[in-house]
Amino acid sequence: MVTITSWKRFKEYLYYDQELGLLLDISRMNFSAEFLRSMAEPMREAYHQLQLLEKGALANPDEGRMVGHYWLRNPDLAPTEEIVQDIKETLKEILDFAEQIHSGRLQGEKGNPFRNILLVGVGGSILGPRFVADALASSRDKMKAFFIDNGDPDGIDRVLSRIGEELPATLCLIISKSGGTIETRNGMLEVRRAYKEAGLSFPDHAVAITQRGSQLDKLSQKEGWLRAFPMWDWVGGRTSLLSAVGLLSLALQGIDVAGLLQGAKDCDGRTRRPDTLDNPGALLALMWYYSTQGQGGKQMVVLPYKDRLELFTKYLQQLIMESLGKEKNLQGETVHQGITVYGNKGSSDQHSYLQQLLEGPDNFFVTFIEVLKDRQGPSTYMEENSTSGEYLQAFLLGTREALTQKGRESLTITVKEVNAYTIGVLIALFERAVSIYALLVGINAYHQPAVEMGKKAAGQAIQLKNNIVEFLKSHPGKKFSVSELALAIQEEEHQEMVFKLLLHLTTNPEHGVNMEPGEPWPESRFFVGGPIS
């Protein structure tokens, strides 16, 4: 158990803020006092760069834009009066719109009060809202939230099936910054079809959250959607939770968005302090830097011991990995930076991969997230004069102790309870840590060039699929092997992709592509229409 030495170290390095309701224990990371001294100057430079960023310095040179998600919870920090007023007015419009929906002054086309929200988006545009909606859900919610966040047709059908006859009472939020994101566009078209088949007008149930002047914004204006709320070029998707992207759906659900914003604002204030030991965001980033030694490849296991925080790991996975996973640094040098984030929740994870954490490769550190308040109201005693919440804490403490005994590092974040304020604190804490770590290792945390590569390759795959279908339809009944087909459409170097596309085409009925199985399987032959005898 804890020794006198570890107790002394715990007290020396514990960050505690009673107003935030936040404790950060870094004592089980094996850094030395010399490490902290050696990082004093790099940290001072990081603080300086962050000050410039918050004042509107160009933070994303690739896209020529500022990065201002910190302004969302404190608009008066924004560098221009136009931005200040835009943030404040948008928040007021969000709250006014939510009040109109809740009061019934704004209803669906057939006089149905809106009781549900359907969010359609992808990535950062929906991970954050989904996390907070789940974390703060209660029996007092004013509306029920549903999410379409993937291009899976069956997944979309499942969501629409759960909504069922409530579709006339469902408000649909389409979230896309550019308005051209394929997954979101496809989700919107699928949902539009569902409204049409139900005899409903999609525009009478639709709200756009997008950049002004985007394709989506123009469509919403042309069709007369209920409303359009802005996204700004200085807010990236993964840091957009406290913009209209998250605040609109959360306000509609009935969540305390003022508390959410206040928690983030208050935490931001603490993470601007120049004293690293009194700055929780800096301490967190510094521990990441210590663990990775400023290099890529380390793994962060996130273990929140609270069901309400189960989706927090997925949210952090995108925030951290998309921000920090970079091939090049700001000087254009190849560095392959990144921290791999995974996890689910405790104590479930103790029965899945804890075995490897204790006895497998030592290539990770654990971030425990502890919530002190077990539930609303008293608990029943189980055994050993203990409640289920006391057992849960014991599992956390026991796992942490076992890791320490094996020489495996961990840090622990503790909050008093899960509410809107503490969720805001946690969001701001990790956003700041990401910014500071990126400055320490000299990378751009605010772009995602590799994601664009994937989108481009996906577009090429769609074009190849269309070429395959067009060729087969122009030769009805004639059978082709993969090699013959690839040669005919001049795609010989992509035979594997041709085969994969054909397997999907033959499994689904839309294009009428058939397969004559071969031996081995890749030697199958493919055709459209009845085979030529």
From Swiss-Prot:
Query: According to its UniProt record, where is this protein located?
Result: Cytoplasm
Q: Which UniProt keywords apply?
A: Cytoplasm, Gluconeogenesis, Glycolysis, Isomerase
User: Which one of the record's GO molecular function terms can you name?
Assistant: carbohydrate derivative binding
Reactions mediated catalytically: alpha-D-glucose 6-phosphate = beta-D-fructose 6-phosphate
Active site per the UniProt annotation: E322, H351, K455
UniProt key word Cell inner membrane: no
Q: Which GO terms describe its cellular component?
A: cytosol
Membrane-spanning residues where?
Answer: none
Q: Which domain of life is it from?
A: Bacteria
- Please tell me whether the keyword Isomerase is annotated for this protein: yes
InterPro entries named among the record's database cross-references:
G6P_Isomerase, Phosphoglucose_isomerase_CS, SIS_dom_sf, SIS_PGI_1, SIS_PGI_2
Q: Name one Pfam family in it.
A: PGI
SUPFAM superfamilies named in the record: SIS domain
- Output one GO BP term: glycolytic process
Q: Which family does it belong to?
A: Belongs to the GPI family.
The task this protein performs is described as:
Catalyzes the reversible isomerization of glucose-6-phosphate to fructose-6-phosphate.
Record-linked NCBIfam families: PRK14096.1
**Protein name per UniProt:** Glucose-6-phosphate isomerase
> Organism, per UniProt?
Desulfitobacterium hafniense (strain Y51)
Q: Which gene encodes it?
A: pgi
